[in-house]
C-alpha cells in the first residue's frame, strides 16, 4: 500500500520531473578525491533553512526562534511577598528585639491570588502569603519565624527595613525588555520565561522530517530469526537515533532489498513527508549498489569520492518536485555514522536554522602516538580524558575497521587526523568531535 494514497505504479514514477539542478560540484584534487570540507560545504550550499511557522512554546524546545520576543508585561506584575508572614510598615517595627518585642493588631489576610487591600493603616499588620500582593503603604514583610504567629495580634521580635522580603514589580523583567533574540536556541528555562510573560506561540524553524532507509537484501529487522547469510539491520536504527539526537523528527522506514524498482518506489513514496531522506548502502562500485544506479532517475544527484576514512563513497541529490534533499551514505555501520557526523548533522542543523551549522570541536592532546594515511582525513574513534587540572587528552579505541560497532559504542569522540600527516606524536594537539555533548 503506497503512502498517503499516492499511485503505486511505473506510470506514476515515469512522470516524476527532474526539476532540480545541482550547483557545480567542487573540483576534485589530483587524486580524484574531494576533501571532507569541500563536500560538507557543497551540501550546505545545496540546502535551505526550513520556513518558520508559529508553534506552541512547549513544542519549541531546542528549536531556533525566528523573531525577537519582547515582554509585554512586568515580572513580577506587582509588588509581592517573598515570604509567608506579616505585611508591615517598617517604621512600626524598626526597634523590635527579642527583649523588647513589638505587638501589633492583625487587621486582615492577603492570600496568593487575592486582591491587595488599598492601604495598611499605621500601627497594624496583615497576614500575607508568599506571592500575594503587598498592601498599599506596607513596605516590608516580617516572616512567620520572627513572630509568635498570632492571628488577632502578633508579637514581632526582629526589626525590619523598608523593602525587606518584598519582590518589586518589574525587578526581574520589565515591560519592553528583550527576552529572546531571533536566532537563539530555545532552552528549558526559555520555555518557562515565555510562559511567564504570557507567550503561548512563537515563530520557529521546525524540526526537519527525516526519513531513514537502509538497503541490502542481507538485512533483517532485530528480533527476527537470522538465516546463515543474513545480518541484523543496525544502520537504520543507528542513523535514525543520530538524526533524532541532532533534533530531527525521524521516520525509520527500515530496509529495502537489492531491488531497483522497490527502492525507487519506496523513496518516491517518502517524498510526501520528508524534508530530508537518508539512505545507507549502495553508493560504492559493486554490482548490487542500487542506490547509485536508481536515485538519479528521481532527480539531480552527485556521487563523489571523499578523501576521508572511513566514509570515502558519498552521494547527494535533490529529488522530486519539491527538490527534497537526499544524502546517500556508505553501508558499513561505522562509515555511515562517521559520515553522518561529518555531513548530515551539519545539514540538519542548517535546516533547523541552528548556527553554527558545523559544531565547534574540542582541542585535545594525543595520549599516545597515532598513525594515519597521508591524503585522507582520518576520523578515528577515541575516548577523551581529563586530569585534575582540566587538561584533556584523547586516546584511540579499537581498530580501523568500518564495521566495528562495539568499538564505536565505547568511543565518546571522533579524532580528526589531518590528511597531510602520517604520524602524530604523543602530546600533539588534535581536533576532536565529542559525541556525547548536548546538541
Describe each region flagged by the PLM.
Residues 41-52, 66, 70, 171, ...:
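Generic secondary-structure signature for well-ordered alpha-helical cores
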Residues 32, 36-40, 53, 57, ...:
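Generic structural signal for well-ordered, non-membrane alpha-helical segments
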Residues 13-37, 86-257, 393, 398, ...:
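Short, glycine/charged-enriched hinge/interface segments at domain edges or termini
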Residues 43, 85, 176, 212, ...:
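Residue-level signal for inorganic ion chemistry
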Residues 81, 121, 142, 272, ...:
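Structured loop/turn residues at beta-strand edges in well-structured enzyme cores
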Residues 1-97, 355-381:
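Short, low-complexity N-terminal leaders and the immediately following helix N-cap/first helix
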Residues 1-37, 200-329, 333-339:
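Helix-rich terminal scaffold detector
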Residues 57-58, 67, 113, 173, ...:
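Flexible glycine/proline-rich
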Amino acid at each position: 500500500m503506497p503512502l498517503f494514497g499516492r499511485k503505486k505504479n511505473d506510470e506514476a514514477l515515469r512522470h516524476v520531473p527532474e526539476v532540480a539542478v545541482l550547483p557545480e560540484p567542487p573540483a576534485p584534487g589530483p587524486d580524484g578525491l574531494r576533501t571532507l570540507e569541500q563536500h560538507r560545504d557543497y551540501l550546505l550550499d545545496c540546502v535551505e533553512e526550513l520556513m518558520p511557522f508559529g508553534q506552541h512554546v512547549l513544542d519549541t524546545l531546542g528549536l531556533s526562534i525566528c523573531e525577537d520576543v519582547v515582554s509585554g508585561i512586568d515580572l513580577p506584575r506587582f509588588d509581592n511577598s517573598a515570604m509567608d508572614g506579616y505585611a508591615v510598615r517598617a517604621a512600626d517595627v524598626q526597634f523590635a528585639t527579642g527583649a523588647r518585642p513589638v505587638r501589633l493588631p492583625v487587621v486582615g489576610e492577603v492570600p496568593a491570588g487575592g486582591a491587595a487591600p488599598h492601604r495598611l493603616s499605621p500601627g497594624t499588620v496583615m497576614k500575607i502569603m508568599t506571592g500575594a500582593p503587598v498592601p498599599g503603604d506596607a513596605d516590608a514583610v516580617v516572616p512567620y519565624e520572627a513572630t509568635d504567629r498570632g492571628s488577632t495580634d502578633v508579637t514581632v521580635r526582629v526589626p525590619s527595613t523598608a523593602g525587606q522580603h518584598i519582590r518589586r514589580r518589574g525587578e526581574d523583567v520589565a515591560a519592553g525588555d528583550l527576552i529572546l533574540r531571533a536566532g537563539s536556541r530555545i532552552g528549558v528555562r526559555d520555555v518557562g520565561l515565555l510562559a511567564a510573560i504570557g507567550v503561548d506561540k512563537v515563530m520557529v524553524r521546525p524540526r526537519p522530517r527525516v526519513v531513514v532507509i537502509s538497503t541490502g537484501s542481507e538485512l533483517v529487522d532485530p528480533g527476527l530469526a537470522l538465516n546463515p547469510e543474513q545480518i541484523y539491520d543496525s544502520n537504520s536504527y543507528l542513523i535514525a537515533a543520530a538524526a533524532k539526537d541532532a533534533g530531527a523528527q525521524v521516520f525509520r522506514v527500515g530496509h529495502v532489498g537489492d531491488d531497483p524498482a522497490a527502492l525507487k518506489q519506496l523513496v518516491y513514496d517518502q517524498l510526501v513527508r520528508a524534508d530530508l531522506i537518508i539512505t545507507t548502502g549502495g553508493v560504492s562500485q559493486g554490482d548490487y549498489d542500487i542506490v547509485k544506479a536508481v536515485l538519479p532517475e528521481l532527480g539531480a544527484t552527485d556521487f563523489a569520492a571523499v578523501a576521508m576514512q572511513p566514509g570515502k563513497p558519498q552521494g547527494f541529490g535533490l529529488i522530486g518536485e519539491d527538490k527534497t534533499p537526499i544524502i546517500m551514505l556508505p553501508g558499513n555501520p561505522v562509515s555511515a555514522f562517521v559520515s553522518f557526523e561529518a555531513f548530515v548533522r551539519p545539514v540538519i542543523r542548517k535546516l533547523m536554522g541552528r548556527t553554527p551549522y558545523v559544531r565547534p570541536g574540542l582541542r585535545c592532546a594525543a595520549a599516545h602516538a597515532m598513525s594515519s594515511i597521508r591524503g585522507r582525513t582520518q576520523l578515528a574513534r577515541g575516548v577523551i580524558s581529563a586530569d585534575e587540572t582540566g587538561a584533556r587528552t584523547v586516546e584511540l579505541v579499537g581498530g580501523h575497521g568500518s564495521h566495528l560497532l562495539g568499538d564505536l559504542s565505547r568511543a565518546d569522540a571522533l579524532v580528526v587526523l589531518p590528511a597531510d600527516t602520517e604520524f602524530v606524536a604523543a602530546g600533539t594537539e588534535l581536533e576532536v568531535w565529542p559525541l556525547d555533548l548536548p546538541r
